[in-house]
Every structure is written in C-alpha cells, then in structure tokens.
Swiss-Prot record:
Catalytic EC class: transferase
Listed InterPro entries: PyrdxlP-dep_Trfase (IPR015424), PyrdxlP-dep_Trfase_major (IPR015421), PyrdxlP-dep_Trfase_small (IPR015422), Ser_HO-MeTrfase (IPR001085), Ser_HO-MeTrfase-like (IPR049943), Ser_HO-MeTrfase_PLP_BS (IPR019798), SHMT-like_dom (IPR039429)
Catalytic activity: (6R)-5,10-methylene-5,6,7,8-tetrahydrofolate + glycine + H2O = (6S)-5,6,7,8-tetrahydrofolate + L-serine
Molecular function terms from GO: glycine hydroxymethyltransferase activity; pyridoxal phosphate binding
Keywords for this protein: Amino-acid biosynthesis, Cytoplasm, One-carbon metabolism, Pyridoxal phosphate, Transferase
Principal cellular location given in the protein's record: cytoplasm
UniProt organism field: Anaeromyxobacter sp. (strain K)
Pfam families per UniProt: SHMT
GO-annotated cellular components: cytosol
Site annotation Plays an important role in substrate specificity: residues: H228
Pathway entry: One-carbon metabolism; tetrahydrofolate interconversion; Amino-acid biosynthesis; glycine biosynthesis; glycine from L-serine: step 1/1
CDD domains attached to this UniProt entry: SHMT
EC nos: 2.1.2.1
Name this polypeptide is given: Serine hydroxymethyltransferase
Amino acid sequence: MMPTQRLAEADPQIAKLIREETRRQAEGLELIASENFVSPAVLEALGSTLTNKYAEGYPGKRYYGGCEVVDQVEQLAIDRAKQLFGADHANVQPHAGSQANMAAYFALAKPGDTVLAMSLNFGGHLTHGSPVNFSGKLFKIVPYGLRQSDETIDMDEVARLAREHRPRILMVGASAYSRTLHFDRFAEIANEVGAAMVVDMAHIAGLVAAGLHPSPVPHSEIVTTTTHKTLRGPRGGMILCREAHAKTLNSQIFPGIQGGPLEHVIAAKAVAFGEALRPEFKAYQRRIVENAQVLAEGLKSAGLRLVSGGTDNHLMLVDLRPKKLTGKIAEEALGRAGITVNKNMIPWDPEKPMTTSGIRVGTPALTTRGMGSREMTLVAALIGRVLDAPADEQVLARVRGEVKDLCAHFPMYADRV
C-alpha cells in the first residue's frame, strides 16, 4: 500500500532540513554565479508524478509502454529549446552539463584525440580537460589561457596552439570568465585547422537566449549547456546541434551514457524554456548584466581588485591578494555574515584549489529576487566591510543583521519557509 503521509509526518528530519535550507536561501544573499532561484512553476513540475515514469528512448521511439504523455512533455521541451536558441536540434535528456559535454566529445572524437580547451586554472571547467576528470583522462588536452596584460583570452595563443596541435575538437566556454566570448573568432581558428568547435555556454545561456551575448549556435558543431544558472531552470543539461549530428548525439546520450531520462526534470526544463521565451525574461537578463556592472564598480570602490578589471556578463572574479586574504577565508567570513560566494582560482593563482586567491561573485539569484542597482551598491559595501575585518565577529554580526533586513524586503518562497 502507498504511504499517504505528507513529508512533515513521514520524515520530519528531512522536512526540517528542507525548511532550514529554504530559510537559508531566503534570509541570505546568494552570490554564487552558478546558482539561481527557480519559479514556483518549475518547482511544481519537479515534484510531479512524472518522476514515476520510465521512458528509455526518445519521443515516439520508446522501449517502454505508457509514454504517450511524457512524449508530449519531452517534445514540448525540445521545441521550446530549439525556438529559444534558433537550433536545428535539441536533446533535453542530459542529467547535467557534464553528461552533455561527454556526449559532445564522444560524438566528435575518439579517446586519445586532441582537444584544445581553456585551462581550469584560467577559468575553464573540469570537463574541459582537467586531469582528474574523464575529459582529461580520455583525451589529449592542450590548454589555452589568458593574456597577462589584460587577463582576457589570448586569441593569438589559441590560434598558435591550434596550428601546432591540430586538435580534433576546439572546446570553447568557461566557468569563471567575466568577458565576452567571441565565437566568430574561435570558429575561424577551428575552420582553419579542421577542428570541430564545441561550445559550453552553461554560464551564459540566459544571456545568449536574451540576445545579450553573442550566440554560439551559428558557429558551432555542437553547443552544450546546463539549464540552471542564468537560464533559471532546474538543475540539468541540454545539447543543441546541427541536424547532421542529431542522430549521433542522441545515441551518445541514450544508450551511450544514460538510461532512462528524468521526465519530471524535463518537464521543469520545458516550463523554464517557456518562461525564457517571454519578453520579461529579456528584461530580467538585462538587469542581471546591469547589476553585475554596478556590483563590480562597488567592489572596486571598496578597494577590491577584479580580474580583467570588470565584467561583461553576470559574474566577476575578485583577486584577494592585495588584501592578503585567501578565497577560503573570504568565503567563510562572508558566509558567517549571510553572504554566499565561492572561493575560486584566479589566473596564475599561487594557492591550492581548496584555498585559492579569489572569490567568484554573480548576480543572477539576487536579480531574480528583484534587487537592482541600489541594492548592488549596498551589497558591494557589505562585502567590503566583511573583507576588511574577516575575523571580527562583531562586524560579521552587524552585516548579517543588515543582510537579513535587506532580504526581508525581497521575500522569496514565503509559503515554504
């Protein structure tokens, strides 16, 4: 017999922890650049009965019966994704961005082939060739980095390395890079050396959808992304590609990497894509960028140095070396003050990855709450006060009180706290 108790009765420990996490999100300033807050509609889809359905295969071609409804759900997600990004084909089944990237690699290259990708030490991602990740273990990785003069991607170096190593794949994308990615220039280099270009736009997908960052779709063989971050959907992945790669990519996801898709998550993706197709989503993305620029200027006014001097997108990297702080110390101090960031390697970082010399800061989540330029100026000042006295518990307590007061003016998930 099916248990009929609600969560609070069936498992009070988990129910209590969920309430605590919801309260933490509601009462603190979320500045992790890869995090965002989904809408109640997305949450509703995630918690739906679609979680019960197994649906190996693709719409119209399933290995299980009873898929007539989830076929419609998944097709809606596919159609909305294609419309949102102007793509020939979309696969919405990847459980995460890592699986999307794995499928892209396997569709275009063989183990041992050369991949030219941005170094994790300069803002890339684990799946772009880190030796501890499958990508670094299966492929020969040639990393590219930044110019020391302005801390932006050294396109001359990318071209030189491409000509020297003739990679099978040129991977473009980053997890901690605050400047515009010029996909047309990367495509020129890829075409010159006969490489297939793959773009991981996980961080900037929302900006791309809103036309606030150049789109990689016209220039790339394959584009991968997560569906959260700036896109403000559920945690998950997606692949966009040219029609010529559709069959191969689909087979790499299923049966190559994954089994049954998570149809409740796919439904939530469809809801988020529908939200992103509305005019107000473009206005939201504009506010993300505007808020990031105001926050960046405020942090500089507080005496902090930003990598590359600022931002073109939703995030910025703060170099803490002039403050004689590590990212670990800054993350912990800000956390005690109710401000959540993540420690992050900066270019040419002398510290270890679990210590770092920087923090990464982003504006998507605070923008979702409705905060604007005025609040960004205040947030920058609060961060500055904490980093000026990271060991002073009185300062941290005062800032935490101000953070809680600020958040109270921008309530979130009020019915769930």
